[in-house]
Structure formats: structure tokens, C-alpha cells
Amino acid sequence: MIEQIVKEINICLENECFLSALGMALTLPDICGKAEYPTDGVTKRYIKWTNEYISAYEKDDSPYGIDMPYLSGEVLYNLRNAILHQGNPNIVSSEIKDIRCKVDEFNLVIGSTFSGDTSSVHYGNDQQIVYRRLDVNIVNLCTKLTRTAEGLSLIHI
């Protein structure tokens, strides 16, 4: 089943149906999470799977990246719910617990897979964070999710 879903996501991307591709891609952590953590609830397994297989490679814990927002499991789960249940391509920061990922501005952008996600932080005079922004490349995100799901499906599903 994963192979067919990935094939259809890729067809959507090739035909520039970016929101359709994203909506389907955001279901992959549900499917893979169910296979990997069958006894966990939906929210827990989605976030857990995403944190383990996607977010672990997005999070920058270097001194220059420690404040930067990133694609956490919470962010992707929030985006999944917004798109699939509300038709809204935005996230609700108040529902995200990780302070680092509570963004003031969230944008979905369309570009090639070579164009990654960007995050920025603005500091006030007292070096306190006053603004966080996260731009997520739809094609890049779909590619990360599909390739990860395909790779893991060979092992688990």
C-alpha cells in the first residue's frame, strides 16, 4: 500500500497538485507509526514516528541553531490536522508544547527539492526572542516523507 500512495504523491507533485500531494504525504506517518508502534494512540505514534525518522534530522542543536524552529513531530501533526480536518495550510502555535517550535509565522512554500526549509529567529534588545518563523518547502517535505516511508516499508510493513 505504501508504494501506491508514494506513487500517487509523486504523480501529484509532477502535475503541480502540491496540496493534494502534501495531504497524502502527511498520512504516511500515520501508516508507518501504526506499523511501528501498534499499541500507541494516534497522536502519540504520529509524533513519535516523525520525531524519530524526520525531526531528528531537522533539529539543529548547534550554538547557532539552538533557538531555531524546526519540523518537529508536533509541528507536522498540527499541520496534518489543519490540512486534513480544516482545509487550512497553517499551524496553531498555541497547540505546540516545544517553545522552540511555537512560531509566529508559518509558511508553506513551493520549490524544488533542492530548496530546503528555512527558519529564523529575531531577538530584541535584551537578546530575548521576539519572533520565530518557519518556512516549509512542500516538495521537500513530501520527498522526505515518501522516501522515509518507502525505506521503512521494506523493513517493517
Describe every region a protein language model picked out.
Residues L108-S153:
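A contiguous, mid-protein "functional segment" used to position or interact
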Residues L19-D60:
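Short, contiguous, well-structured surface segments enriched in hydrophobic/aromatic residues
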Residues I5-E8, M24-T27, L79:
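Short, hydrophobic/aromatic alpha-helical segments in well-folded domains
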Residues C17, Y37-G41, N90-L108:
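Anionic, Ser/Thr-rich low-complexity intrinsically disordered regions
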Residues M1-L19:
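Charged alpha-helical initiation segments
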Residues I155-I157:
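Conserved small/polar residues in nucleotide/adenosyl-binding loops
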Residues P69-D98:
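Histidine-centered, metal-coordinating catalytic motifs and their short helical/loop contexts
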